[in-house]
């Protein structure tokens, strides 16, 4: 990311991000909620190979129809919309993500929990695209090459998915007469409503910034937003891994469901809270060292966005790990729909005066409202009556974060900190070392559990080596 920020600059980077935001809307439109619905359904029936094959083919057929329809719609909008003419080449190139995203069936492999395949494939594709990035992108004029690499990085691995999924589908005993596409329409549409609402407050800011303020402000906003999204991606990946297992437990073992739910809550909290604090206090160093002086306008933007790490973690916990497994996606849809409407209104109100900072503020409010409404309905409907939160463990995490905040205030305002790469690396390592030391000192359950697991593994490997 630092390399791309410095080579492309705000304007060229903004062009690619603007086109990407447009394509992401069409991806959501064509997917109609199947990526989330598919994970849940596949997780529930993965032991029944015949039903697994039938359900997978049904969902792929729906996706084929919606993808074709979306391409037709995209073609007409690109041709007729004069504001898109300067981005036609980028939109055509990046539209390949529509096909690869939908027919790659990532939801299938998440549903069967083939984590080894997902991880290896992810790492290989990331390494290839990183190498291509340094070889092909050398100047601001290379933004088309960068767009191609974004496509490969985002959905390149889906080539392999399309080949591998054939091994799981029993085609001999499957014909179109037994397929029932209609049964999936209503639940996918409910999830689709939530997905499109979330996308409004994730993508509308970029779209409106490009339309109302210009590519430069999109660049400023994208740098701050992308830095956060790397951490958020880690959080959402944990959520994606846990969703199929919790969906399975909700059907087969309620006690295990609530046990895993409590562990998941503390995992999310341990990661997201210090991340939000870190981005707030280190925003200047992060932007200047990762993007350069030309992106200094992104510093305030990153500060505003920093609490989103925590809010997204809570949204995933309440939405994906409680509401979705319990088939209460309507509550999630309503919550994010209200948030999206508020986000759109705030963007229109704040963007002209505050540009990217107005968009950041709108997104922050939207994320908060989404979590607030989810918690309100979950408590009201007593959906967590069997969830016994360990208050003492929660206090250990909150106290550790509180001490971390106080230490950073003292360091920032009373001591001089060097703003160079070495100082940044040392400060970052020290920040997280102090945090995890505090958790260990207070004997926080999650950290102690991880250390005990490592302790069991290491002696075993040592003994194996001695044999």
Residue ranges and their predicted role:
Residues 28-31, 36, 57-89, 93, ...:
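Alpha-helical transmembrane segments of multi-pass membrane transport and lipid-handling proteins
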């Amino acid at each position: 990311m630092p390399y791309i920020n410095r080579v492309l600059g705000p304007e060229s980077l903004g062009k690619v991000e603007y086109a990407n935001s447009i394509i992401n809307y069409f991806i959501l439109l064509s997917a109609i909620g199947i990526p989330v619905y598919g994970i849940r359904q596949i997780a529930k029936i993965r032991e029944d190979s015949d039903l697994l094959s039938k359900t997978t083919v049904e969902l792929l057929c729906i996706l084929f129809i919606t993808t074709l329809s979306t391409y037709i719609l995209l073609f007409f909008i690109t041709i007729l919309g004069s504001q898109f003419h300067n981005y036609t080449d980028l939109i055509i190139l990046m539209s390949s993500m529509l096909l690869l995203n939908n027919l790659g069936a990532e939801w299938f492999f998440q549903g069967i929990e083939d984590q080894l395949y997902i991880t290896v494939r992810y790492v290989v594709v990331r390494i290839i695209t990183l190498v291509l990035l340094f070889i092909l992108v050398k100047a601001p004029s290379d933004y088309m090459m960068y767009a191609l690499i974004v496509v490969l990085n985002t959905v390149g691995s889906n080539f392999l998915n399309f080949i591998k999924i054939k091994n799981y589908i029993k085609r001999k005993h499957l014909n179109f007469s037994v397929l029932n596409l209609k049964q999936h329409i209503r639940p996918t549409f409910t999830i689709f409503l939530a997905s499109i609402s979330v996308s409004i407050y994730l993508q509308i800011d970029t779209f409106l910034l490009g339309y109302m303020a210009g590519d430069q402000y999109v660049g400023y906003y994208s740098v701050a937003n992308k830095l956060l999204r790397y951490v958020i991606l880690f959080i959402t990946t944990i959520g994606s891994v846990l969703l199929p297992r919790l969906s399975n437990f909700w059907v087969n073992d309620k006690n295990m469901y609530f046990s895993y739910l409590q562990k998941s809550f503390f995992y999310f909290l341990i990661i997201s809270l210090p991340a939000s604090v870190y981005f707030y206090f280190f925003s200047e160093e992060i932007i200047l060292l990762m993007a350069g002086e030309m992106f200094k306008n992104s510093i305030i933007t990153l500060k505003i966005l920093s609490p989103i790490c925590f809010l997204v973690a809570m949204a995933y916990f309440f939405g994906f790990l409680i509401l979705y497994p319990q088939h209460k996606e309507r509550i999630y849809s309503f919550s994010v729909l209200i948030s999206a409407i508020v986000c759109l209104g705030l963007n229109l109100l704040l963007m002209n005066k505050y540009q990217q900072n107005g968009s950041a503020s709108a997104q922050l409010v939207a994320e908060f409202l989404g979590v607030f409404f989810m918690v309100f309905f979950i408590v009201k409907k007593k959906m967590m009556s069997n969830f016994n939160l360990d208050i003492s463990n929660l206090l250990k995490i909150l106290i550790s974060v509180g001490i971390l905040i106080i230490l950073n205030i003292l360091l920032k305002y009373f001591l001089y900190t060097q703003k160079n790469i070495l100082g940044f690396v040392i400060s970052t390592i020290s920040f997280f070392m102090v945090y995890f030391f505090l958790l260990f000192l207070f004997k926080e359950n999650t950290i102690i559990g991880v250390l005990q697991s490592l302790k069991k593994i290491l002696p075993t490997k040592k003994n194996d080596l001695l044999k």
